[in-house]
């Protein structure tokens, strides 16, 4: 339990930031899920369109320290590789 007023304020700030980050993380995961569903269905055009939306979401999340930048790059790389395999 926070005792000082500054600690109480820090607790409030953390709660607000956590709520914002949770929302952004959910939005990012949703956009990635759409790409994965398009890949699973074999629809290359839909996957490319979804990827065009998902990649900026991932990189924005990395920039805002919601996920690690290497994790974002790895996810983009794996999704791109999966889409490329659809063309073959």
UniProtKB/Swiss-Prot annotation:
Q: Which GO terms describe its molecular function?
A: small ribosomal subunit rRNA binding; structural constituent of ribosome
NCBIfam families cross-referenced by the UniProt entry: S20
- Where do the record's region annotations for Disordered lie? 1-28
Entry keyword set: Ribonucleoprotein, Ribosomal protein, RNA-binding, rRNA-binding
Coiled-coil regions in this chain?
A: none
Q: Which gene encodes it?
A: rpsT
Q: Does the keyword Transit peptide apply?
A: no
The Gene Ontology biological process annotation of the record reads:
translation
Q: What name does the UniProt record give this protein?
A: Small ribosomal subunit protein bS20
Q: Give the InterPro entries listed for this entry.
A: Ribosomal_bS20, Ribosomal_bS20_sf
Please give the GO cellular component terms listed in this UniProt entry: cytosol; small ribosomal subunit
Family indicated by similarity: Belongs to the bacterial ribosomal protein bS20 family.
* Primary role: Binds directly to 16S ribosomal RNA.
Asked if the keyword RNA-binding belongs to this entry, the reply reads: yes
* Signal peptide limits: none
Question: This protein's superkingdom?
Answer: Bacteria
């Amino acid at each position: 339990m926070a005792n000082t007023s500054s600690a109480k304020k820090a607790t409030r700030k953390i709660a607000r930031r956590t709520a914002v980050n949770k929302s952004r993380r959910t939005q990012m995961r949703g956009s990635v899920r759409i790409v994965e569903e398009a890949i699973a269905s074999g629809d290359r055009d839909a996957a490319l369109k979804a990827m065009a939306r998902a990649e900026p979401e991932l990189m924005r999340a990395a920039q805002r320290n919601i996920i690690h930048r290497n994790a974002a790059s790895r996810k983009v790389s794996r999704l791109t590789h999966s889409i490329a395999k659809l063309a073959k």
